[in-house]
From Swiss-Prot:
GO terms for cellular component: cytoplasm. It is found in: Cytoplasm. Pfam families: Methyltransf_5. Keywords: Cytoplasm, Methyltransferase, rRNA processing, S-adenosyl-L-methionine, Transferase. Transmembrane segments: none annotated. The keyword Protein biosynthesis does not apply. This is Ribosomal RNA small subunit methyltransferase H. Specifically methylates the N4 position of cytidine in position 1402 (C1402) of 16S rRNA. S-adenosyl-L-methionine binds at A33, G34, H35, D53, D101, Q108. It comes from Herpetosiphon aurantiacus (strain ATCC 23779 / DSM 785 / 114-95).
Amino acid sequence: MVSMHIPVLYDAALAALNLRPDGRYIDGTLGWAGHSSGILEGSGPTGRLLAIDQDPMALAAARERLAPYGERATIVHGNYRQMASLAAQHGWQQVDGILLDIGVSSPQLDLPERGFSFQYDAPLDMRMNPTRGESAADLIAQLDETSLANLIYEYGEERLSRRIARRIVEQRSKSPITSTAQLASLVKSAVGGQAGKTHPATRTFQALRIAVNDELGALREGLAAATNLLAPGGRLAVITFHSLEDRIVKEWMRDQASECLIPAKLEILACPHNCAANTGPRSCIYPVGRDCDYVPTLEVLSRKPIEATPEELKANPRARSAKLRVAERRLTKTLAS
């Protein structure tokens, strides 16, 4: 049974965007349009929204939900990492706010055929866009044991990754691993069925989902695209659900808000910014006495992540790991690298 999708941190996210009546906004992760409908309500009657999602099923549901807003809502099929080109296709050069709600939605988790959850026995898929790319079953059939262990460790932060990878490789030599229940059982047997609130397969499923959809790569590209699209004073609000995502967002906002600390007295020094003195991908060459010309692009508005209130957690337990970080575009024309 598919649960009703309740958008997490709804009030906090809309407040973070600082909505205004004539603004232009992007929801890079449209989903079932919970946040999008709030953006349109808060920016009415002339505010516009470009809503992006890669899941055809979510798009169908969102189109129905946003139909009352007419031409104020433009819905496109794509990945938010492509938002710069998608915005340009619709004549948008700058926007007043961008929302990214990273990760898998409740309906995706609750539909067995999508293969995201170990709660059901279903095909091992995990693709956000089920019409493109390799499934999780394809991935674990192709990777060697070391690569599989590294993937589970890096993306799932699973300390028993080598044991799990070894068990998967042993099983696939006998028969293909094609279902969620089959994989969950293998992981549980590999780690010894350790007791606890979290299912033993949780981290492995997370790791495979992230890899199948290149979620961290999309996040990095999406943050860069979003920063460049924001008009001065525009807001970027990003909701994450696990430490890997949150770390990327935190570091991106921090780096884009930081002054360059390259001292003028040094002639050659590695520089993290794409300044005019940059002569290669890894270093800037400075004449003596010249500073890096990088100008910060963002101001971080949330020094600590915003989390769900006790009231929201009671209504929506899946919001327990959600974190919202917010930044504002500085009044400068210098674009982020």
